[in-house]
Amino acid sequence: MKIILIGTVEFSKEMLRTLIENNFKIQAVITSSNSEINSDYSDLKPLCDKNDIPCHISDDINSNRTIELIKNYEADVIYCFGWSRLLKKDLISLPPLGVIGYHPAELPKNRGRHPIIWALVLGLKETASTFFIMNEEADTGDIVSQVKVKIDGNDNAKSLYKKLSSAAQEQVIEITNN
């Protein structure tokens, strides 16, 4: 399976590393330039360079230039992890298997930004690690994989993030194998 990964945060790097370590074929990575407003920004280029994966910078994922670039790779699936802008239909419709996104919440509940913080603020006892087929709206597509994650009384944002990330790493391997 030919994969393109779109992402720009630490979670994107973790998922990319997981896919590489499990010998999946990454055609290319699309990332953005560093942003002062994104505290979780992570440079994916060094990991791509180390593994001979083309890495492209796009600050407008929906531009004709970026869509043509992605189209030329003829990917079977696009993984979009840690990208804070909505994707347009022209991009979403490219890969035959769709664009798969990730949200660290029990969709359809807790859509939108900062779901880990909200899970803690709301006093939830559990949340979920959720992969879904992306559409033009935020966090609304069909669920591909959802694993519940228990929230303990002593969890904070960092510890809950680690639990969700660990679950997601197992899920992305399973999804990609199937």
Residue ranges and their predicted role:
Residues 22, 77-178:
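Donor/substrate-binding cores of folate-linked one-carbon enzymes
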